[in-house]
């Protein structure tokens, strides 16, 4: 079976985007892993499937990590999604309603080509994240082997654990991130974020993503970090979130309000691959 796809990225967080509306798609976890493999397949952080909506949305949006596991949400992917459906003539709407496992998100294509996404209302209740804790708190102490780390925990449709660090370049993202990702207090695993506060409207961020490892950028991670910082009184909206590859801009007006994320979405190339595995 030949599979048509488009390679895209949002600040280097890269995706294989597949139109499953106009071509029949049935991919096994093994096929997903092979497609995402940077040596044996196309290579990406996540695979995005565009499907027909089941409800009153315009499209259904499915996200698979490089390990083949399906996840609830991906902010950078949502921006690439709306860019794809516009570029391929699948809609002419500036504002698109997209079904995800975590609910409906509403990306909007801006006049300058950037994409703004209503990422929904963040969740702080440990049961909803999910995170094992007796009650909601601004920060929690997490035991890692012989030490404790202070985290904020929030769901942006997927779970995040955010730490504040003084030196982002030397933060233990690659060594500590995998430990936090699989910590027993996060039943569905977690994305581990490390943020350095530059000023009340600017942070630098690195994220070790659940099922993908450290990525060059993470949209839901940017939202979670900004929200956690605002909750703790460290930040004020709007927040510029800087990754090594560029910036996202996050707006959040407080409790029970949606988070808005603005950033780029870039198409790299179109391709076709024979699925012989």
UniProtKB/Swiss-Prot annotation:
Q: What Gene Ontology terms for biological process does this UniProt record contain? A: lysine biosynthetic process via diaminopimelate
Q: Where in the cell is it found?
A: Cytoplasm
The domain of life is Bacteria
Please name the pathway. Answer: Amino-acid biosynthesis; L-lysine biosynthesis via DAP pathway; DL-2,6-diaminopimelate from LL-2,6-diaminopimelate: step 1/1
| Coiled-coil annotated spans | none
- Documented EC number(s): 5.1.1.7
Give one Pfam hit by family name. Answer: DAP_epimerase
- Give, as one word, the top-level EC class: isomerase
* UniProt keyword Cytoplasm present: yes
Keyword field: Amino-acid biosynthesis, Cytoplasm, Isomerase, Lysine biosynthesis
Indicate the annotated site residue(s) for Could be important to modulate the pK values of the two catalytic cysteine residues: 160, 209
MF annotations from Gene Ontology:
diaminopimelate epimerase activity
Q: What does the entry list as the binding residues for substrate? A: 13, 46, 65, 75-76, 158, 191, 209-210, 219-220
PANTHER family from the UniProt entry: DIAMINOPIMELATE EPIMERASE, DIAMINOPIMELATE EPIMERASE, CHLOROPLASTIC
Q: What is this protein called in UniProt?
A: Diaminopimelate epimerase
Q: What lineage does the source organism belong to?
A: Bacteria, Pseudomonadati, Pseudomonadota, Betaproteobacteria, Nitrosomonadales
What gene does this protein come from?
A: dapF
């Amino acid at each position: 079976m030949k599979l048509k796809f488009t390679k895209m990225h949002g600040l280097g967080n890269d995706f294989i985007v597949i139109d499953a509306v106009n071509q029949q798609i049935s991919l096994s976890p093994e096929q997903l892993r092979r497609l995402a493999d940077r040596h044996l397949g196309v290579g990406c952080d996540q695979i995005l499937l565009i499907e027909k909506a089941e409800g009153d949305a315009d499209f259904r949006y499915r996200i698979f990590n490089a390990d083949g596991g399906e996840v609830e949400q991906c902010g950078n992917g949502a921006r690439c999604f709306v860019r794809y459906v516009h570029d391929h003539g699948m809609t002419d709407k500036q504002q698109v309603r997209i079904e995800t496992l975590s609910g409906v998100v509403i990306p909007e294509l801006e006049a300058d080509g950037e994409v703004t996404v209503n990422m929904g209302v963040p969740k702080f209740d440990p049961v909803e994240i999910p995170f094992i804790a007796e009650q909601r708190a601004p920060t929690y102490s997490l035991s890692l082997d012989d030490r404790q780390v202070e985290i904020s925990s929030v769901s942006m449709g997927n779970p995040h654990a955010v730490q504040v660090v003084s030196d982002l370049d030397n933060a233990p993202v690659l060594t500590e991130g995998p430990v936090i990702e699989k910590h027993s207090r996060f039943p569905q695993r977690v994305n581990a974020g490390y943020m350095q506060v530059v000023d009340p409207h600017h942070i630098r961020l690195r994220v070790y993503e659940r099922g993908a490892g450290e990525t060059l950028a993470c949209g839901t991670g940017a939202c979670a970090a900004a929200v956690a910082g605002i909750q703790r009184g460290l930040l004020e909206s709007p927040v510029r979130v800087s990754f090594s590859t560029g910036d996202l801009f996050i707006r959040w007006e407080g409790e029970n309000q949606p988070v808005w994320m603005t950033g780029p979405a870039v198409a790299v190339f179109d391709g076709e691959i024979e699925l012989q595995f």
